[in-house]
């Protein structure tokens, strides 16, 4: 008999690819806000998983059909198991997941968002520790949310571009930024 998953395994074995934000129509479709840079995760038929909280064991669903809402980071998905609006509404705020083993390969200089969270941030010029990466925002330009050691109640947003973030060393859990005037204010 298989051992039950530990809390850590429940979280580490999965990648959150989106959040169900609304029901769509009357046939059980849902709207999903993407947390992935890979549209195929929402357009390709196959197995996906959902859970309400990271402490829950993910439940499987079969993606039957998916399409992107033009100009938005939203997808409309239809799952075989969800057949009416009431079932779809019950899934609002659930996380949509794939196994961590399904990570797609990246080009050099590309990173999975989950790998950036928790990295220790250092000043590129003098090596001083500045804080920790606590969030990631996809906007016009990607932004790192950094909680500073000197002011842990404040998050600063730093553009995630090579000119400002020249060094990312995942194995060392290290990220370096070039501090320019006003960047960390």
Curated annotation (Swiss-Prot):
Highest taxon of source: Bacteria
Family, as annotated: Belongs to the RimM family.
Q: What is its main location?
A: cytoplasm
Q: Which PANTHER family match?
A: RIBOSOME MATURATION FACTOR RIMM
Cysteines engaged in disulfide bonds, as pairs: none
SUPFAM superfamilies, per database record: PRC-barrel domain (SSF50346), Translation proteins (SSF50447)
Which positions fall inside the PRC barrel domain? 108-183
Keywords attached to this Swiss-Prot or TrEMBL record, sorted alphabetically, are: Chaperone, Cytoplasm, Ribosome biogenesis, rRNA processing
- Reported function: An accessory protein needed during the final step in the assembly of 30S ribosomal subunit, possibly for assembly of the head region. Essential for efficient processing of 16S rRNA. May be needed both before and after RbfA during the maturation of 16S rRNA. It has affinity for free ribosomal 30S subunits but not for 70S ribosomes.
The question of whether Hydrolase is a record keyword is answered with no
Describe the protein's quaternary organization and the partners it interacts with.
Answer: Binds ribosomal protein uS19.
**Where in or outside the cell is it found?**
Cytoplasm
Q: What is this protein called?
A: Ribosome maturation factor RimM
| Entry GO MF terms | ribosome binding
Q: What is known of its domains?
A: The PRC barrel domain binds ribosomal protein uS19.
From its record, what is one biological process in GO terms? maturation of SSU-rRNA
- Naturally occurring in which organism (per UniProt): Synechocystis sp. (strain ATCC 27184 / PCC 6803 / Kazusa)
Q: Which GO terms describe its cellular component?
A: cytosol; ribosome
InterPro entries named among the record's database cross-references: PRC-brl_dom, PRC_barrel-like_sf, RimM, RimM_N, RimM_N_sf, Transl_B-barrel_sf
């Amino acid at each position: 008999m298989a051992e039950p998953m530990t809390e850590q395994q429940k979280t580490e074995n999965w990648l959150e690819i989106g959040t169900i934000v609304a029901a769509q129509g009357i046939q059980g479709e849902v709207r999903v806000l993407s947390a992935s840079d890979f549209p195929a995760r929402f357009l390709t038929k196959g197995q996906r998983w959902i859970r309400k909280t990271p402490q829950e064991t993910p439940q499987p669903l079969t993606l039957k059909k998916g399409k992107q809402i033009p100009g938005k980071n939203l997808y409309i998905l239809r799952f075989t198991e969800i057949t009416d609006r009431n079932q779809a509404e019950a899934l609002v705020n659930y996380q949509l997941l794939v196994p961590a083993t399904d990570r797609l390969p990246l080009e050099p200089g590309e990173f999975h968002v989950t790998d950036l969270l928790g990295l220790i941030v250092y000043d590129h010029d003098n090596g001083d520790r500045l804080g920790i990466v606590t969030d990631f925002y996809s906007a016009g330009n990607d932004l790192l949310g950094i909680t500073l050691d000197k002011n842990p109640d404040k998050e600063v947003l730093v553009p995630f571009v090579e000119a400002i973030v020249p060094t990312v060393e995942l194995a060392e859990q290290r990220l370096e930024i070039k501090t320019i005037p006003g960047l960390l204010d």
